[in-house]
């Protein structure tokens, strides 16, 4: 009997990237998508994922604040942080917060898949 697909919540405001995730990971994961931090928190409660992929820059909040809320609501959930920020400040901002991966955009989707699978 096949194992059930892992549930992955992608919190990403870029429509093109959400479409890329949906197409690339179809059949590999059960996916849910949120374009804002508030949508992400609602889905986190309504459909708890096995893994969260979190963009650091969202229209209604920043990723650090959202990561703190996620940790408070769902301690232990594996979080993979993604960002287009190339400076060191975003990396320093999440130090001390639990996450299992940090990817700079653009990144290879196979790399993201490997991190999701390992989480």
Which stretches of residues belong to each language-model region?
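Two-component/phosphorelay signaling modules centered on CheY-like receiver
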Residues: 14-32
């Amino acid at each position: 009997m096949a194992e059930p697909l892992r549930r992955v919540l992608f919190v990403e405001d870029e429509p093109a990237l959400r479409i890329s995730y949906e197409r690339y990971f179809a059949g590999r994961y059960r996916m849910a998508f949120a374009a804002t931090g508030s949508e992400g928190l609602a889905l986190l409660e309504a459909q708890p994922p096995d893994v969260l992929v979190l963009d650091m820059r969202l229209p209604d909040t920043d990723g650090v604040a959202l990561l703190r809320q996620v940790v408070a609501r769902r301690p232990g959930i594996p979080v993979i942080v993604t960002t287009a920020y190339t400076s060191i400040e975003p990396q320093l901002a999440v130090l001390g917060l639990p996450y299992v991966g940090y990817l700079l955009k653009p990144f290879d989707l196979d790399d993201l898949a490997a991190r999701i699978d390992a989480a």
